[in-house]
Design a protein with these regions (language model features):
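Glycine-centered short loops/turns at secondary-structure junctions
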Residues: 125, 152, 307-308
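C-terminal helix-rich "cap/oligomerization" subdomain common to oxidoreductases
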Residues: 105, 279-322
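Rossmann-like dinucleotide-binding domain that binds NAD(P)(H)
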Residues: 182-247, 288-295
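N-terminal glycine-/serine-/threonine-rich beta1-alpha1-beta2 phosphate-ribose binding loop
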Residues: 5, 21-124, 150, 313, ...
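A contiguous active-site-proximal alpha/beta segment in oxidoreductase catalytic domains
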Residues: 134-193
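Bacterial N-terminal signal peptides
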Residues: 7-15
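Short helix/strand-capping hinge loops at secondary-structure junctions
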Residues: 125-127, 132-133
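Hydrophobic residues in well-ordered beta-strands that form the structural core
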Residues: 92, 130, 155-157
């Protein structure tokens, strides 16, 4: 798959003129999150201290979810900002928008429409980044990656917390093999999504950044102050724990010692990786790892439904159609 994505990246660049190859045209879908103006300013504004060159947001599809207040109350304002401040052209359909861009970012705060929004992008063979949450259900997560694999289109997803400097250092081997990690983040719940998909995904993403794949089961409980606590068992006796809290913190332990993790280092590192993936066709996070991350969070919900019983990831993946 990696070779396929790399070849696709080369074909993408070859199809562009020298001028456009230096500046990819980005289309955004779903203008109802603060990530929209933040990412656009990083890409379109050379005066931004975190400016990422090589791409520009030029087109967008408004989107929005009437039944989610944080979407309905902000989509018009963010759309106005993109048009008036950055000169972004708004299209009435995703199918029309993709004709005018080289790559796409799905930013809709609501994960439920992500599959439907991804389908025309994948059909048009445009490299795609999907902001958190990748989807509104584990079943949709699996289907997005299935469609991407069949089409040979690079598709990936990540929280910006994955690219905190401390977490990346541990992932790169600063502690050797990680045997234990715990992370925290806010975990506000949106009733239309599994509990951790909405915001707890941030801390869970950090956990998987340092632990990697291999989680076999989870048990969900509560902390002493009544917050969410999820304990995951990894192959080889390794343990990873997510806890709901106000801040982004964590600790990783490995063969060479331990180190704090979890700090938020801004959006720019994530945007850098997104543009790099668009340019090369090589995704920085495998579908296998992202699927396991969402299975971890789905299993946490199933554990809650069963009163804190241990639930395997294999079980929830099978139920979701894998």
């Amino acid at each position: 798959m990696k070779r396929t994505f790399l070849a696709l990246g080369f074909l993408l660049l070859a199809a562009l003129s020298p001028a456009s190859a230096a500046e990819l045209r980005i289309g955004m879908i779903g203008l109802d999150t603060s990530h929209v103006p933040a990412f656009t300013d990083i890409l379109n504004n050379p005066a931004n201290k975190n400016h990422v060159p090589g791409a520009k947001v030029v087109a967008a599809f408004k989107g929005g979810s009437a039944d989610i207040e944080s979407s309905a109350s902000r989509v018009d304002g963010f759309t106005k900002t993109l048009v008036e401040k950055y000169g972004v052209k708004i299209y009435d359909s995703i199918e029309e928008m993709v004709k005018h861009v080289d790559a796409v970012m799905i930013e809709s705060v609501d994960g439920r429409p992500h599959l439907a929004q991804a389908i025309p992008v994948i059909k048009a063979r445009k490299p795609l980044f999907i902001d958190k949450p990748l989807a509104g259900s584990l079943r949709d997560v699996l289907e997005i990656f299935r469609l991407a694999k069949v089409a040979g289109v690079p598709v990936w997803s990540s929280s910006s917390l994955r690219y905190g400097k401390a977490a990346q250092a541990v992932r790169a081997g600063s502690l050797g093999k990680v045997t234990y990690a715990e992370t925290t983040s806010p975990a506000s719940i949106e009733k239309s999504h599994p509990d951790l998909f909405w915001y707890g995904v941030h801390g869970c993403e950090t956990l998987f950044t340092v632990m990697g794949t291999g989680c076999e089961s989870v048990k969900r409980g509560t902390t002493a102050d009544g917050k969410i606590e999820v304990i995951g068992k990894w192959k080889g006796g390794r343990t990873g724990i997510f806890r709901e809290a106000k801040g982004y913190t964590g600790l990783a332990k490995g063969e060479k010692g331990e180190a704090p993790i979890g700090a938020y280092d801004g959006y720019a590192p994530l945007v850098v990786e997104a543009i790099k993936a668009f340019q090369t066709g090589v995704v920085p996070v495998s579908s296998e790892e992202t699927i396991e991350l969402f299975a971890f969070m789905e299993a946490a919900d199933e554990s809650k439904r069963r009163g804190g019983a241990e639930v395997t990831l294999a079980e929830v993946l099978k139920k979701a159609g894998k």
